[in-house]
Design a protein with these regions (language model features):
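Conserved two-metal-ion catalytic palm core of "right-hand" nucleic acid polymerases
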Residues: 69, 134-135
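Extended amphipathic, helix-rich lipid-handling scaffolds
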Residues: 1-128, 143-194
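A compact, surface-exposed functional segment
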Residues: 140
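Short, T/G/N/S-enriched strand-turn elements that build extracellular solenoid repeat scaffolds
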Residues: 55, 135-136
């Protein structure tokens, strides 16, 4: 329109894709203007995944910033309790196809993709393994040199849970092998800053 603002309301968009991917619900209010893309009350659901976003904004100085999305676009958002199943991700990242795991999460995002701060992150991969705290990523797009700062409010896991993650499916040569002595510790709890 003339003001440069486009607004769209989606309500319960769904489809079955030929590959087997099934979208049960795509809903939300979307706004695009010369400085921002904003999603409010965003819902993305499949039979195994549910992403619920109170609001998320992608802010930029001008549309040219979208060409350098990972550095030039500033993200602010709040994600309510959500879950992602790796089977659903595998439609977009085929190497994840054989991973049978669901991740539950919520948190608040601030920053660019490359330098992202996640506040009040609640992340759970099993009833025994979870993380609650803040995470600050510096250089996230260069994983080999990425710095990760953790403010751990509450974290717990066990040797068996960590070893159950099949790292070979993430492209690494070997799965995690921890010393037998750690098994005697049972469930390990952590708090602090790293």
């Amino acid at each position: 329109n003339r003001s440069g603002i486009t607004s769209v309301d989606l309500e319960k968009v769904n489809f079955n894709e030929r590959s087997g991917f099934k979208l049960v619900d795509l809903s939300g209010h979307f706004v695009l203007n010369p400085k921002k893309i904003k999603l409010e009350k965003f819902v993305f659901k499949t039979p195994k995944t549910a992403l619920n976003c109170k609001g998320i904004a992608f802010n930029y100085k001008d549309l040219d910033d979208l060409n350098d999305f990972v550095n030039a676009v500033y993200i602010e958002g709040s994600i309510q309790q959500s879950k992602i199943d790796f089977k659903d991700l595998s439609y977009f990242v085929p190497s994840l196809q054989s991973i049978e795991r669901t991740i539950d999460f919520s948190g608040n995002l601030k920053g660019s993709i490359n330098n992202l701060f996640v506040e009040d992150l609640n992340l759970s991969v099993s009833p025994l393994s979870y993380f609650k705290g803040d995470v600050d990523f510096k250089g996230l797009t260069d994983l080999e040199n990425c710095l990760i700062y953790l403010d751990i409010h509450n974290c717990q896991t066990s040797k068996l849970d960590l070893e159950s993650i099949n790292l070979e499916k993430f492209g690494l040569k070997n799965n995690l092998k921890l010393p037998v002595e750690l098994e005697r510790l049972g469930v390990v709890k952590l708090k602090g800053k790293l």
